[in-house]
A protein has these predicted regions:
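Histidine-centered active-site/metal-ligand motif
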Residues: 74, 78, 135-138
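Metalloprotease/metallohydrolase-associated module, dominated by Zn2+-dependent proteases
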Residues: 4-8, 97-231
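Acidic helix-start/capping segments at beta-turn-to-alpha-helix junctions
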Residues: 25-26, 94-97
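Catalytic Zn2+-binding segment of zinc metalloproteases
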Residues: 75-95
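Auxiliary, metal-adjacent structural segments of Zn-dependent hydrolase domains
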Residues: 1-57
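Coil-to-alpha-helix initiation sites in intrinsically disordered, low-complexity, charged segments
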Residues: 25-26, 85-86, 184, 213
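Short pre-active-site segment immediately N-terminal to the catalytic Zn-binding motif
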Residues: 45-72, 87
Length: 231
């Protein structure tokens, strides 16, 4: 059993979680067509639908097992968010405001009542309008990414200065590509760098482990996976 498999199995004791692969899923291939604005959706991004975490392919995990473990931990945060808020509410909040575009379909009723043509205005929500809930959920998810990076680097034996430098660089990349960039459709261009700077302080001081049980569970699962793999 690989370290990744041991980690996923241990996480399964606390969360209903499955691992799938985009290159083997027709649904993911269809979704990839809809995500035209994110060219790396099928090859570089991991997506959670329900309780299934879809990786691009099996080689993605084999080539960077520790990276895949970090990503799975990130997606567990989204699963926990969904369990807390309920699937329907979580999905609406995460996709808002772009999900409002669906009401443009009411235009099809214009042949019954002409004013339905005004529903074409809902297509404006396809624009990269800031998404406050998506931003909130992804800050929580990427905080887990930084937390796992810190945990793994400490376990490997890197010194504090190196870890702080790497976490800071990672936070800058995450903000630029995923919050300010097209990865999540320019979801939030303001102040995320400052939020991550504070999160890194909380991670390094140990505060963050005491504020959310998800971190404790993920940490235990990772350490259990490392121990099982070394045996």
């Amino acid at each position: 059993m690989s370290k990744f498999e041991a980690f996923a199995e241990d996480l399964g004791r606390n969360y209903v979680i499955r691992v799938g692969y985009k290159d083997k899923s027709w649904f993911m291939k269809f979704l990839g067509l809809l995500m035209f604005f994110n060219r790396g959706f099928m090859t570089h991004y991991i997506t959670t639908i329900g309780n299934t975490v879809y990786f691009p392919n099996e080689d993605f995990i084999k080539k960077n097992e520790l990276g895949a473990i970090t990503v799975l931990a990130h997606e567990v945060v989204h699963i926990a968010q969904k369990e807390k808020r309920g699937f329907a509410l979580f999905a609406f909040e995460y996709l808002f405001p772009q999900c409002l575009t669906i009401f443009a379909l009411l235009t099809l009723l214009a042949f019954v009542w002409l004013p339905f043509l005004w529903c074409l205005l809902f297509l404006l929500f396809l624009a990269p309008i800031p998404a406050p809930w998506r931003k909130k959920f992804e800050v929580e998810g990427y905080t887990m990414t930084l937390y796992m990076s810190d945990l793994i680097m400490r376990q490997i034996g890197h010194d504090d200065d190196y870890i702080l430098k790497e976490l800071s660089l990672s936070a800058v990349r995450i903000d630029r590509l995923n919050f300010r960039g097209s990865g999540y459709w320019y979801m939030w261009p303001w102040g995320v760098d400052e939020e991550f700077a504070k999160k890194i302080e909380d991670i390094r001081s140990g505060v963050i482990s005491d504020t959310d049980e998800v971190y404790g569970r993920v940490r235990r699962s990772y350490l259990n996976a490392v121990s099982a793999y070394e045996l």
